[in-house]
Amino acid sequence: MPDIEGRIAALPIWSGPVTLAPLPGGISNLSFAATDQRGKFVVRVTRDFPFHHVFRDRELMSARAAHAAGFAPAVVHAEPGLMVSRFIDGRTLTVADVQASIPRIAEFLARFHRDMPAQLSGPGFIFWVFHVNRDYLRQLRDSGQPAAQLDRWLATNAELEAAQVPLPITVGHHDLLAGNLIDDGRRLWLIDYEYAGLGTAMFDLANLSSNNNFTPAQSRELLAAYFGHDPDEQLLRSHAAMEAASLLREALWSFVSVNHLDRPGVDYAAYGRENIVKLDAALAAWHERFGQ
């Protein structure tokens, strides 16, 4: 990437000299910590990823809405290819932290889903994981991947979609990795809005639990805390199906990324295979518990 640090340093928003340091983590985007006389910021180097349904105008719209609703840091500057936000001085959560904070995070998500729609402006963007999976499978088919395996995953995707229960449309985050939650000692913050958009709460709930290795008991605890009552069998079945759909999406995301992304040190194919192993285990458990 030609002299990206020089471009960042030349932005007119800085007060005095600016110091840049690459931020670790992330398997698709590059970010820097930037410090000037006013404080610390995060600079996100961006471009559209149409193959992943990621468009940066939508990310910016969602990030600004999340700040207005009280969930995300302020965006202080945005231009094609760059987005600058306030740095949150806090501790990035781990998987163990998420598992130990289920009621707190459930309450946070319930507020997020309640308060975000009123702050969102501009054209709506739908995130429906089953459509995303179908499109990923179409892309993989077009790139020459073996049809038999793709057909099996397509049938699995349809089976999991049929298990969903009706829920209201809201605004979801759709990328609930532990690393996107920050605790500043007083409250939680949620960052990284490239997949945010309209959808149902179920994907956020299942994405959180599947990304953070919840047990069935922990998933039940999450649903009870979020909905305010013990989940019935239909809700549990729907959530477990969505967990599997989330794992399928993560695997297909990886396989599609092989053809488009090249972050140093990231083996997208291996990451995809890891998620297929998790998917197969989740499907076996789902069928054993809830039947075909």
Where are each of the predicted segments found?
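An alpha-helical support segment within catalytic cores of ATP-dependent transferases
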Residues: 1-19, 117-174, 184, 231-235
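Active-site acidic catalytic loop and adjacent metal/ATP-binding pocket
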Residues: 22-43, 158-203
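Start-of-helix signal in alpha-solenoid helical-repeat scaffolds, especially tetratricopeptide repeats
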Residues: 237, 241-244
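Charged catalytic carboxylate motif
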Residues: 104, 108, 152, 204, ...
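ATP/Mg2+ or Mg2+-diphosphate-binding catalytic cores
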Residues: 139-148, 252-292
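Active-site activation/catalytic loop segments of kinase-like enzymes and analogous catalytic loops
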Residues: 202-231, 244-263, 278
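ATP-binding pocket architecture of kinase catalytic cores
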Residues: 22-127, 132-148, 166
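Activation segment
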Residues: 48, 90, 188, 196-198, ...
